[in-house]
Every structure is written in structure tokens, then in C-alpha cells.
Amino acid sequence: GNVAELTEVR
């Protein structure tokens, strides 16, 4: 769990 991954809108 990265912050970048969490904030990416998919």
C-alpha cells in the first residue's frame, strides 16, 4: 500500500 497507489483514480 503506497500513498500514490491509494490516490490514483482508476
UniProtKB/Swiss-Prot annotation:
The pH dependence is: Active from pH 1 to 10.
- Please describe how the activity of this protein depends on temperature: Thermostable.
Note whether Lipoprotein occurs among the keywords: no
Kindly list the biological process annotations in GO that this record carries. Answer: defense response to bacterium; killing of cells of another organism
Alphabetically sorted, this entry's keywords are: Antibiotic, Antimicrobial, Bacteriocin
Q: Does the keyword Ion transport apply?
A: no
Q: What does the function comment of this entry state? A: Has antimicrobial activity against L.paracasei BGKP20.
Identify this protein by name.
Answer: Bacteriocin BacGR
Species of the source: Lacticaseibacillus paracasei
